[in-house]
Amino acid sequence: MSVSAFNRRWAAVILEALTRHGVRHVCIAPGSRSTPLTLAAAENPAFIHHTHFDERGLGHLALGLAKVSQQPVAVIVTSGTAVANLYPALIEAGLTGEKLILLTADRPPELIDCGANQAIRQAGMFASHPSQTLSLPRPTQDIPARWLVSTIDNALAMLHAGALHINCPFAEPLYGDMNDTGLVWQQRLGDWWQDEKPWLREARRLASDKQRDWFFWRQKRGVVVAGRMSAEEGKKVAQWAQTLGWPLIGDVLSQTGQPLPCADLWLGNAKAVTELQQAQIVVQLGSSLTGKRLLQWQATCEPEEYWVIDNIEGRLDPAHHRGRRLVAKIADWLELHPAEKRKPWCVGIPRLAELAWQRVVAQRDTFGEAQLAHRIRDYLPEQGQLFVGNSLVVRLIDALSQLPAGYPVYSNRGASGIDGLLSTAAGVQRASAKSTLAIVGDLSALYDLNALALLRQVSAPFVLIVVNNNGGQIFSLLPTPQSKRERFYLMPQNVHFDHAAAMFNLRYHRPENWEELESALAGAWRTPATTVIELVVNDTDGAQTLQQLLAQVSHL
């Protein structure tokens, strides 16, 4: 019997089973113990293969692919700390709902806890963060192939959102020519190999029913809060709120067009808060809200009912309102709960939003971080997409810009870490093949610098704007101790990114005014290549401009 040959047949069943559940993208890191999985993926024509040498970046690449494709994405890594590097992407997927299938190769049981090289306790290592976990046995013909395929099918059928961790131990030898070992075992699955359906089909219904009293609540004074959702859902939510006559507070990731722009500014005005207190119901569609003032208002508002609608399970309301947690796709929920045409009840806030917007526009000519956030809609590629980093940049865009309705916007706003942002953006671009604008801060870029390797080959223009404010300037917005701020919070690195771009053979520009930026962008959108644009800005101007605008708008 050939151990290596049967390892490959065992792995081939696993990978083929994944194709029956919509898996098309497979992300692979180099490794020896994962050889059976890697070869099975490489030999399966149903897959699009992606490779990366860094497992942490690989996990985030898969995350980006899943965000756009809305299908599960598989990841293959070898044993040991390679597995641990998937943790950040796994956590993010659990909070934002993307489906990741993590296939982690492992040593066989007799090599665990005995000093064997590259052998750690992988089973259950991710604690409660995966939505599903599956620890497979060592490949053996004593276990029928139908057990293996039905076990994979069951785990995937139960995966509503988040990650499925499948731990796969393989014994040596891992290499060798294929022979007939296990062929009969494999053939017992019959014509399943030529079929396109799962071996085991399970129906799992997870969607909230129609709220029978909706006809009553839609006649009340309501507020719509729009969080993270798809571009198509964003347009539908905007129309739905407009028909109801309810004010829509749109997050930067809502893709609703933010009909009341600068919400994070005008929510700091007491007049706005007073008017919103008249709301009898708040309907929040989507989670992961960004704006600080929005979160403060959400925490203190007390409507009669607070509904949260999202396709992700679990509680998504940190303020713990009395109301309803409805698990459903937003588009499906809107269809079950049609709007009734009514006049707007909230008349003061639209004027406040207009005045706040005018204050922002008045400062747009200065070359700076806050002004870039405001102008970002002018720089979006036609029929393209936007990826927004975390920390200060996403808050500035949320507060100061107004993105077009239905324009695709992506970000990692689940755990909101700055790790893996470039890798995620690379996955977003690969899944869509659209022109992509990504914007991150300098520390975020440094954190994921080797992901520039993923951007060397792109299928459409990719522009990475690195806003270099020399450190974590978001801490300038917080009451951090002044004497300790620079060393222990901001951590300025005093670096530029021209050499990094050159190392990976990427185009690079460092504009010093808006005209130079616009010229660099115009050239970048004409070429299917990656262009790094570094905006070196005053360290504190972005945070200070936001604080000044907040003060101005609070007194309108």
UniProtKB/Swiss-Prot annotation:
<comment type="similarity">
    <text>Belongs to the TPP enzyme family. MenD subfamily.</text>
</comment>
<keyword id="KW-0464">Manganese</keyword>
<dbReference type="GO" id="GO:0030145">
    <property type="term" value="F:manganese ion binding"/>
</dbReference>
<dbReference type="Pfam" id="PF02775">
    <property type="entry name" value="TPP_enzyme_C"/>
</dbReference>
<dbReference type="InterPro" id="IPR011766">
    <property type="entry name" value="TPP_enzyme_TPP-bd"/>
</dbReference>
<comment type="function">
    <text>Catalyzes the thiamine diphosphate-dependent decarboxylation of 2-oxoglutarate and the subsequent addition of the resulting succinic semialdehyde-thiamine pyrophosphate anion to isochorismate to yield 2-succinyl-5-enolpyruvyl-6-hydroxy-3-cyclohexene-1-carboxylate (SEPHCHC).</text>
</comment>
<dbReference type="Pfam" id="PF16582">
    <property type="entry name" value="TPP_enzyme_M_2"/>
</dbReference>
<dbReference type="InterPro" id="IPR004433">
    <property type="entry name" value="MenaQ_synth_MenD"/>
</dbReference>
<dbReference type="GO" id="GO:0030976">
    <property type="term" value="F:thiamine pyrophosphate binding"/>
</dbReference>
<comment type="subunit">
    <text>Homodimer.</text>
</comment>
<keyword id="KW-0460">Magnesium</keyword>
<keyword id="KW-0786">Thiamine pyrophosphate</keyword>
<keyword id="KW-0808">Transferase</keyword>
<dbReference type="InterPro" id="IPR032264">
    <property type="entry name" value="MenD_middle"/>
</dbReference>
<dbReference type="Pfam" id="PF02776">
    <property type="entry name" value="TPP_enzyme_N"/>
</dbReference>
<dbReference type="GO" id="GO:0000287">
    <property type="term" value="F:magnesium ion binding"/>
</dbReference>
<comment type="pathway">
    <text>Quinol/quinone metabolism; 1,4-dihydroxy-2-naphthoate biosynthesis; 1,4-dihydroxy-2-naphthoate from chorismate: step 2/7.</text>
</comment>
<dbReference type="GO" id="GO:0070204">
    <property type="term" value="F:2-succinyl-5-enolpyruvyl-6-hydroxy-3-cyclohexene-1-carboxylic-acid synthase activity"/>
</dbReference>
<keyword id="KW-0479">Metal-binding</keyword>
<comment type="pathway">
    <text>Quinol/quinone metabolism; menaquinone biosynthesis.</text>
</comment>
<dbReference type="InterPro" id="IPR012001">
    <property type="entry name" value="Thiamin_PyroP_enz_TPP-bd_dom"/>
</dbReference>
<keyword id="KW-0474">Menaquinone biosynthesis</keyword>
<dbReference type="GO" id="GO:0009234">
    <property type="term" value="P:menaquinone biosynthetic process"/>
</dbReference>
<dbReference type="InterPro" id="IPR029061">
    <property type="entry name" value="THDP-binding"/>
</dbReference>
<protein>
    <recommendedName>
        <fullName>2-succinyl-5-enolpyruvyl-6-hydroxy-3-cyclohexene-1-carboxylate synthase</fullName>
        <ecNumber>2.2.1.9</ecNumber>
    </recommendedName>
</protein>
